[in-house]
Swiss-Prot record:
Name of the featured protein: Cell division protein ZapC
One cellular component term from this protein's GO annotations in UniProt: cytoplasm
One GO BP annotation of this record: division septum assembly
Keywords, alphabetical: Cell cycle, Cell division, Cytoplasm, Septation
Subunit structure: Interacts directly with FtsZ.
Length: 180
């Protein structure tokens, strides 16, 4: 799916679906992963897609381009990242699920990072949505992950302490752009 930010896009909360939505202005609607209980009060007032949203969109889109996700999955991840950055309530870190590293990482917004599950040693890929001195708000940047018996899916949010994060190693596969 190829989408491009537009000043006609608008944010709104859909009570029927209990989700934050983004009207993409060309007959397409994006339904986020986030329900009312996860959203800040300003999510319930309709608002336009601003220049800051567009800049953040391009940051996330550029960083996700090299991921092994399909184009539809990348679009879903990027749009959920925008919702999380703008409207998600603060989360408490859930770092006990992941192994600590000696050198805490200071990730940048939009950076792909990896975590190692403490119970299995499995690696998971996350997208940093918001960075802080000690922890980062991240979204799951892979189709699924089981964390302590609970399933997470692409775009689910989790806050992780920086000492659990490590740089994500890109897969060494050749990817070709597709001409349309």
């Amino acid at each position: 799916m190829k989408i491009k930010p537009d000043d006609k896009w608008r944010w709104f909360y859909d009570a029927e679906h209990d989700r934050m939505m983004l009207d993409l202005a060309d007959g397409m609607l994006f339904r986020s992963r986030y329900a009312r209980k996860m959203l800040t009060p300003d999510a319930f007032t309709e608002s336009g897609f601003c220049v800051d949203d567009a800049a953040l969109y391009f940051t996330f889109e550029e960083k996700c381009r090299q991921s092994p996700l399909s184009s539809d999955q990348r679009a879903e991840l990027v749009l959920n990242a925008l919702v999380a950055a703008r409207f998600l309530k603060p989360l408490m870190p859930k770092s006990w699920h992941f192994s600590a590293h000696r050198q805490p990482m200071q990730p940048a917004v939009g950076e792909m990072v990896a975590v190692t599950l403490a119970d299995s040693g499995e690696q998971a890929r996350l997208l940093v949505v918001e960075n802080g001195d000690n922890a980062a708000l991240c979204l799951l940047a892979q189709p699924a992950l089981t964390l302590a018996g609970k399933g997470m899916v692409l775009g689910d949010a989790i806050k992780v302490m920086n000492d659990r994060l490590q740089p994500h190693q890109q897969e060494k596969t050749t990817r070709y752009a597709r001409a349309v």
